[in-house]
Design a protein with these regions (language model features):
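Bacterial N-terminal signal peptides that target proteins for export
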Residues: 2-13
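Bacterial N-terminal signal peptides
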Residues: 11-22
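Boundary of Sec targeting at the N-terminus
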Residues: 27-31
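Conserved hydrophobic register position within alpha-solenoid helical repeats
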Residues: 42-43, 74, 103, 135, ...
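Amphipathic alpha-helical scaffolding segments comprising HEAT/armadillo-like alpha-solenoid repeats
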Residues: 52-62, 84-125, 144-156, 175-187, ...
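Short inter-helical turns and helix N-cap capping residues of alpha-solenoid HEAT/ARM repeat scaffolds
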Residues: 66-67, 127-128, 158-159, 189-191, ...
Length: 430
């Protein structure tokens, strides 16, 4: 009698999981506006048959028999857009690859078989969290009407574990019809269900969810506050700015991070003050997130705080601050600290500073840029050339002429283009 080998058996099925999101659409894509484009697959119906109950049972059973960490890794990979198409290697003696590929393609399609749907719905109540989540995501990600209907029904069941899993599946489905079901779930007595419903509403990106999600920002549970903040960031509605701002002072690091990231996603200038405050947070993770978020908000009023952050004790904060300065709207003058960063010991910061100076286009930085070119590494030379090309200050012409003879092709090309543009401008003036 041969002994069972659950781990190898699981890995055979796990191969199928790696691209569950690479479902092929039912028809070839429509023509684009470019009439030169042709597509032999236009109007051709492609294979759409999803897994039957036997395939689903084998997959779920393999997950249940696996190590919990491996199972969770597998479930996380559902929906992360891993594409199996880049791994077309010869099978050689690995004949099992051909069989697994055919099974993978079947599992990657939406589930429509009634028996398979019933098995997945039953698995929503599994004792193992990762099995519940796998079932929920397989039901939701296909966005087929019947699985979504089953998920909406499961959101009203008496088992809180099933309700939590159903909310996850509805988040993957992104079905606007589930909005009211998920909004009601925000008042669930089980906090895990509330958190998952908040997550799902963020995935729907429905502005109607702003008010109920804002109410969760006052929840006693920090994970609920953080999840609500993340969801509001996904929706990107500026009405949430004022309610998210105070959370940059929350006692929990995960809540502060979620609020800062959400404010960056919303890109409302009114968030500038809160993000500047977060730029001075004692936790380096918050400072990094704040620097990046200020670049996304693009308010030139943050220039002073970002310039000050160029002296932060953390290298990543300094780099992000330098980058953010180049992203601010209509910043007329380059901060002196950004210009000074051209001589920073860190080569990446030097390059970022040069690129940002190019975005700002301040001619007062030209002398420092020309000085920094001599002896600079290739990436910095390229950044300097791009920066000089963005200004009308002709004091940079000598460096551009030198760069036009650089051994690096990208530098030569960029410098030559800049010099040509200047000659054309001179001809126009004449």
């Amino acid at each position: 009698m041969t002994s069972a080998r659950p781990f190898p058996a699981f890995m055979g099925v796990f191969v199928l999981l790696l691209s569950l999101t690479s479902w092929i659409p039912a028809y070839g894509q429509a023509h684009r506006e470019n009439y030169d484009d042709t597509d032999p697959w236009i109007g051709v119906r492609l294979e759409t048959r999803g897994p039957d109950s036997a395939a689903v049972a084998g997959f779920v059973g393999a997950l249940a028999a696996s190590d919990p960490a491996v199972c969770q890794f597998a479930v996380t990979s559902i929906g992360n857009y891993w594409n199996h198409g880049d791994d077309e290697f010869p099978t050689g003696n690995l004949k099992d690859e051909e069989t697994q590929e055919a099974r993978r393609q079947t599992l990657s399609r939406p589930v429509s078989d009634p028996a398979a749907i019933a098995l997945l719905v039953q698995s929503l109540g599994s004792a193992q969290p990762c099995v519940r989540r796998a079932a929920a995501r397989m039901l939701g990600r296909g966005r087929e009407p019947e699985p979504v209907r089953q998920l909406r029904s499961a959101l009203r069941t008496g088992d809180s574990r099933v309700r939590e899993a159903a909310a996850l599946g509805l988040g993957d489905a992104e079905d606007p019809g589930a909005f009211h079901d998920l909004a009601r779930a925000l008042k669930d007595k089980d906090v895990a269900v509330v958190r998952m419903a908040a997550y799902a509403l963020g995935e729907l990106e429905d502005a109607r969810a702003v008010k109920p999600l804002e109410d969760l920002l006052r929840a006693d549970d920090p994970d609920t506050r953080a999840t609500a903040a993340v969801a509001l960031g996904e929706i990107e509605d500026i009405r949430a700015t004022d309610r998210l701002g105070p959370l940059v002072r929350d006692r929990e690091i995960r809540v502060r991070l979620a609020a800062v990231n959400a404010l960056g996603e919303i890109e409302d200038h009114r968030a500038t003050g809160a993000l500047i405050e977060a730029l001075r947070d004692k936790d380096v993770r918050v400072r990094r997130a704040a620097a990046e978020a200020l670049g996304e908000v693009e308010n030139p009023g943050a220039a002073g705080a970002l310039a000050q952050a160029l002296e932060d004790g953390d290298l990543v904060v300094r780099r992000l601050a330098a980058q953010a300065l180049g992203e601010l709207d209509n910043l007329k003058r380059a901060p002196a600290r950004l210009v000074a960063a051209l001589a920073d010991p860190d080569s990446e910061l030097r390059t970022i500073a040069a690129m940002s100076l190019g975005e700002i286009g301040d001619s007062t930085a030209v002398p420092a840029l020309t000085k920094a070119y001599v002896g600079a590494e290739p990436r910095l030379r390229y950044g300097i050339v791009k920066a000089l090309a963005e200004t009308d200050d002709r004091r940079g012409d000598a460096v551009l002429a030198l760069a036009a003879q650089d051994k690096d092709q990208a530098i030569r090309h960029t410098a030559a283009e800049a010099l040509k543009d200047r000659r054309d401008d001179d001809d126009d003036d004449d």
